[in-house]
Every structure is written in structure tokens, then in C-alpha cells.
């Protein structure tokens, strides 16, 4: 018999990246932002707020895909490279 677990997760900015609402903003180019979406339903994944990653299940393997959506944060974007980093912490529930 397998135990049933769910997974909670927390998405956080790392290094010089910050957030504006549910958008990750690179420290080296604040004119762009990145929103993370669940691929299955295109819902926004919140930053700095725990969310349910996997519902309680007896499945031994679960795959969750995400999308990163780039958006302009200003009407006068700065062209060029940028670096943004986020980490995801996962918790058994």
C-alpha cells in the first residue's frame, strides 16, 4: 500500500530579481517581466505565496509543466539581454 501525498510549492525570486505582483522582474532590466503559468490551464503561478502543486494522489510519478510569458513593464522598454532567476521550494502535504 502506498501513502497518499500532495505537494505544496513556493515560487520565490532569487539574486537581484524581484517581483511586482505575480511578475518576476530582472534586476538588470526592469522594463521587462516574466509571468509563470501552469501549462494545463494557463493560470498564473503566484510568487511568494504557497500554492498547491500536486493534489493528494497515490500516483508515483506526476508531471507538471509550466510556461514563462515575457511582458513589457513600461512603454519604453530597454532592449538587450537580461537575467532573472526564481527558485521553487516543494513541501509534502
Question: What is the role of each PLM region?
Answer:
Residues 1-93:
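Mature extracellular/passenger domains of Gram-negative fimbrial/pilin and adhesin proteins
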